[in-house]
Amino acid sequence: MKKSLTIALALVAIFVLVLTACAPAATATEAPAATQPPTEVATEAPTEAPVATEAPATEAPTVAPPTNTPPPPPVCDKLADAPAAPAAGELGSADNPIVITFVPSGDTGKITVAGTAIADCLTQMTGLTFKMEVGTTFAASIEALGAEKAQVSFLNTFSTLLAEQKYGVTPALVAIRKYATNDLDPDKDLGGELEPFYKGQFIANADSGISSFADLKGKSFCFVDPNSTSGYIVPRIILKANGIDPDADFSATQNAGSHPNVATAVYKGDCDAGVTFINVLTDAAADLQATYPDIADKVKVFAVTDRIPNDGMQFIKSLDPNLQKVIVEGMLAMANDPGGKAVLKALYNYDAFQEVQPDFYNDFAAVLTKAGVDPSELVK
């Protein structure tokens, strides 16, 4: 029995050894587990990579870019020398407001918003009541002054000359702007400097074949308005000096109503060429590139005008000098306030104001007279 037990135990031991030798090692079957995690991470990582490109850091500029930060509202604190409140019915009272007329030399919607902000701010500063209106044409603003339906105006340069000659309107402030220029401008080194003058530019559709004044014959042409200095009066003088009769040499002409409208018409091919202020194509207030991103490529400049004194603010001659003084003070205060600056920038791209004497435009008027231009004959 004992011998049989010994033999049985020996057989069991041999059987275990055989099984052990035939079975795969435990470490060999578990080794893939150790190598699998890196394999899974490596193959899945590319599918998760777009998360990095969608990170908030790359989206932030489109959500809230610094340039879109709204400007602060204008500070309209009451002026120290504000006049006493007018009696009912007097000029400046609620039922007889001081009317400010603005010429439609740009986007009338933007002009209306900015003009309303100016009227409201002057009301708070002076204790007087102001009301704004945008003329349907340049001439409409002039005639409102002549009829004393408006007492304050923001006219362009030539309209100021007309209003001076016809109704005795006097300039009080001239606009100071960062000088806009282009590559053809002899004064391009002044670009960005604050100056009381500007220039006009002749533009053409890039596909029109126009590169000089001589090429304009037989083409269609867009002006701004018959009372626009850089968009009509001065360009006509220059056209005639370069052998182009603006009344006979074009296949068609039209008055587009504003400088941005001229640029848009040329861009769309409604006019082969036209004239605007420098440089309406990239002007911040006109903001044409927001609607037509390629406008500077499809519209080309081929000539520029001489210097033209800037526009500004004027008064009718019968307005009380004390009221004139306080209005000037209020406008200068707005021009020195960040919120006020933003309003003036949106209005007509003003950067600042400079007080001027009544004879400020006399030299320019003399140039026009020498060229045979009589402002009194051009009131439309």
Regions found by a protein language model. Give the residues of each.
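Bacterial N-terminal signal peptides
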Residues: 10-20
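Periplasmic-binding protein-like
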Residues: 103, 176-188, 196-199, 253-256, ...
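Ligand-binding "clamshell"
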Residues: 163-190, 246, 284-302, 371, ...
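A ligand-binding cleft/hinge motif common to bilobed small-molecule-binding domains
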Residues: 157-168, 235-241, 267, 272-296
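Bacterial lipoprotein signal-peptidase II cleavage site
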Residues: 19-31
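Bilobed "Venus flytrap"/periplasmic-binding protein-like clamshell domains
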Residues: 95-125, 131, 135, 158, ...
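Short, glycine-/small- and polar/acidic-enriched structural segments
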Residues: 42, 64-208
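An extracytoplasmic/periplasmic, membrane-proximal ligand-sensing/linker region
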Residues: 37, 60, 68-117, 319-380
